[in-house]
């Protein structure tokens, strides 16, 4: 009987101890990593609003280890394109999402 009581008490305190430890573990809200916003400069070579693409010959972009080249960027709903035209020198920001370069902001530069 004494042995059974010892086993029962040990089991009870073990369960209480584990519950106390579990309650001390705080689950922090994990925020999703925000994509890196990359800044660049270049010259607009073409705009296709129907397919939501803009072609820019950009300077080297160190943040993504890209050399100077001409490439297409996807125009997003937040991109204000009203003052941009082919031939403009521009400063722009984009995020890389897989194979897509999503244009976030673009402005005519001097």
UniProtKB/Swiss-Prot annotation:
It holds the Pfam family CusF_Ec. One of its GO terms (biological process) is detoxification of copper ion. Keywords: Copper, Metal-binding, Periplasm, Signal. Changing residue 72 to A: Wild-type Cu(+) binding, 50% decrease in Cu transfer from CopA. The keyword Flavoprotein does not apply. GO terms for cellular component: outer membrane-bounded periplasmic space; periplasmic space. It comes from the Bacteria. GO terms for molecular function: copper chaperone activity; copper ion binding; metallochaperone activity; transition metal ion binding. The keyword Transcription regulation does not apply. Residues 1-21 form the signal peptide. Its main location: periplasm. Induction: Transcriptionally regulated by CusR in response to copper and silver ions. It is found in: Periplasm. InterPro entries: CusF_Ec, CusF_sf. Part of a cation efflux system that mediates resistance to copper and silver. Binds one copper per polypeptide. The cus efflux system is composed of CusA, CusB, CusC and CusF. Interacts with copper-exporting P-type ATPase CopA; when this protein is precharged with copper it binds very little CopA. The cus system plays an important role in copper tolerance under anaerobic growth and, under extreme copper stress, in aerobic growth. This is Cation efflux system protein CusF. It comes from Escherichia coli (strain K12). The lineage of its organism: Bacteria, Pseudomonadati, Pseudomonadota, Gammaproteobacteria, Enterobacterales.
């Amino acid at each position: 009987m004494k042995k059974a009581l010892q086993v029962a008490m040990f089991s009870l305190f073990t369960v209480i101890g584990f519950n106390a430890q579990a309650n001390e573990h705080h689950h922090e809200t994990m925020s999703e990593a925000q994509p890196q916003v990359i800044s660049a400069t270049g010259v607009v070579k073409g705009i296709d609003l129907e397919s939501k693409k803009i072609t820019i010959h950009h300077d080297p972009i160190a943040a993504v280890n890209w050399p100077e080249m001409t490439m297409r960027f996807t125009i997003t709903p937040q991109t204000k394109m009203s003052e941009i035209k082919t031939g403009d020198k521009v400063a722009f920001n984009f995020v890389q999402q897989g194979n897509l370069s999503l244009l976030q902001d673009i402005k005519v530069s001097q």
